[in-house]
């Protein structure tokens, strides 16, 4: 059985990708990050996901991205912005962008993949996020994969490492629809940038608004609780 390394945040995208990798019959090794994020609730949500999909091993890696901040998710001096509906969302990179986050996460995933002998890494990025988050575009994934195969022992030995981004051309609406078809229980996910201490989502941050809109377009109620 082929092994995969899945980046798992506890949000809707990574949960859907986990289901896709499971459907493809990979032996799954999941990797999550405790990087000083406000939305630490996501790390509690992944527990149910790893049980459902029989994850072989789950690594939670501690990284202190608060050391340099620069994002509303890692710096208490920067407020998480709230919006009034889907049409009010910004078309520029917002303050919730975490500098180089996907590059950092993928680098750890590559290291883990080399150790366990996996040539397949899965990440839940998609182009519909790329206007706000530049490390979610196809060109980024392609360039990172090329770099990895130039700069790793596996790569130079001809054991090509592939960065799988199965959601890359999907909208959030399509991602939720795909996950529902695969039986993803979105009750065990959280997207909010600033949830309460008892894991209630705010409903007004960029992530919550996009999530709620996607469920609405699928004519289904979001199963998580909001303030």
UniProtKB/Swiss-Prot annotation:
Cofactor note: Binds 1 zinc ion per subunit.
Keyword Plastid part of the UniProt annotation: no
One GO MF term: zinc ion binding
Residue sites binding ATP per the record: 8-18
EC number: 6.3.4.20
Top-tier EC class: ligase
Cofactor: Zn(2+)
Reactions catalysed, as given in the entry: 7-carboxy-7-deazaguanine + NH4(+) + ATP = 7-cyano-7-deazaguanine + ADP + phosphate + H2O + H(+)
Pathway(s): Purine metabolism; 7-cyano-7-deazaguanine biosynthesis
Gene Ontology process terms (BP): queuosine biosynthetic process
Residue numbers binding Zn(2+): 192, 202, 205, 208
Alphabetical list of Pfam families matching this protein: QueC (PF06508)
Alphabetical keyword list: ATP-binding, Ligase, Metal-binding, Nucleotide-binding, Queuosine biosynthesis, Zinc
UniProt xrefs under InterPro entries: QueC (IPR018317), Rossmann-like_a/b/a_fold (IPR014729)
PANTHER family (UniProt xref): 7-CYANO-7-DEAZAGUANINE SYNTHASE
Known function: Catalyzes the ATP-dependent conversion of 7-carboxy-7-deazaguanine (CDG) to 7-cyano-7-deazaguanine (preQ(0)).
UniProt family annotation: Belongs to the QueC family.
HAMAP family the UniProt entry points to: QueC
Protein name: 7-cyano-7-deazaguanine synthase
UniProt organism field: Rickettsia prowazekii (strain Madrid E)
């Amino acid at each position: 059985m082929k092994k995969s390394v899945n980046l798992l945040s506890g949000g809707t995208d990574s949960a859907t990708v986990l289901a896709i990798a499971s459907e493809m019959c990979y032996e799954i090794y999941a990797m999550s990050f405790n990087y000083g994020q406000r939305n630490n609730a996501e790390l509690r949500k992944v527990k149910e996901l790893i049980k459902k999909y029989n994850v072989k091993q789950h690594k939670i890696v501690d990284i202190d991205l608060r050391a340099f901040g620069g994002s509303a998710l890692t710096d208490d001096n920067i407020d998480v912005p709230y919006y009034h509906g889907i049409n009010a969302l910004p078309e520029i990179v917002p303050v919730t962008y975490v500098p180089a986050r996907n590059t950092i996460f993928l680098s750890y995933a590559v290291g883990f993949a080399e150790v366990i002998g996996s040539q397949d890494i899965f990440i839940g990025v998609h182009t519909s996020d790329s206007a706000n988050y530049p490390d979610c575009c196809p060109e980024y994934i392609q360039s990172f994969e090329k770099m990895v195969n130039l700069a790793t022992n596996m790569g130079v030995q001809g054991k090509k490492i592939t960065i799988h981004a199965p959601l890359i051309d999907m909208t959030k609406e399509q991602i939720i629809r795909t996950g529902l078809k695969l039986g993803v229980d979105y009750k065990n996910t959280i997207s909010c940038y600033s949830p309460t201490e008892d894991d209630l989502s705010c409903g007004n941050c960029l992530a919550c608004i996009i999530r709620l809109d996607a469920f609405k377009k699928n004519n289904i109620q979001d199963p998580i609780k909001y303030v």
